[in-house]
Amino acid sequence: RLKKINPKLIYLSISGFGQNGPMSYKPAMDPVLQAFTGFMSENKGPDDIPHRTPVIIFDMTTALYATQLISTSLYARINEKFGRKIEISLMEAAAAMQSIRLMSGYMEGPYTHASSPSGTFKTKDGWIQIIVVKNHEFIKFCNAVGWKKFINDKRFVSNAKRRKHEAILSREVQKLFFKEKTDYWKNLLDNFEVQNEKVQNYKEFIESE
């Protein structure tokens, strides 16, 4: 009916699970898609419980994809005499956003850290996130925290071996980080060019320099 009024109309329709198929009738918002698409299973904490992120990540991702589709349709309409109907679902957007991890997870199984030590560690007054990937980065980390004895430790001489002994290494890092405040570790690691960052809330992020 709208097409008859304006043949060049671009119409966008967003659904939870698509316009067709066995789940097309179901209502769905972001938390439901976080559960359905495997995102929560990939977002487990040390307690091994799947966690939902309170950020409505798939709502926002769907909006971004929709904006791109509308933009390309508007561009195409310059040389066309007709508009189009665009259909997109939260499920499709969630799958597209996770495509790399989705395929590797399907082929290789549950997620394991790509590097070690890596993760979020509790400090004396907060939390800090670190990531150490390459061997020279591990050496920098050891020099920064005074772990010279671990540089040539056979358990930690390569990333593959560090991953194999991740539980031991992470436990040692946690024991160490709990001794000092976050800013102490941040400044120390920054001086040695080790990737790290304080876990901030929104207020801290907005007010950061």
Language-model segment annotations:
Residues 94, 165, 204-208:
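Beta-rich nucleic-acid/ligand-interaction surfaces
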Residues 117-196, 203:
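Aromatic-enriched alpha-helical interface/lid elements that frame and gate functional surfaces
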Residues 21, 161, 207-209:
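Short Asp/Glu-rich motifs
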Residues 3-128:
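Active-site-adjacent "lid/gating" segments in soluble enzymes
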Residues 13, 198-199:
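General beta-strand structural signal in soluble alpha/beta enzymes
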Residues 108, 114, 202-209:
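Active-site-adjacent capping/gating segments
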Residues 74-78, 177, 206:
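Hydrophobic residues in alpha-helical segments
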Residues 91-93, 133, 199:
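Short, well-ordered beta-to-alpha junction loops that form the rim of enzyme active sites
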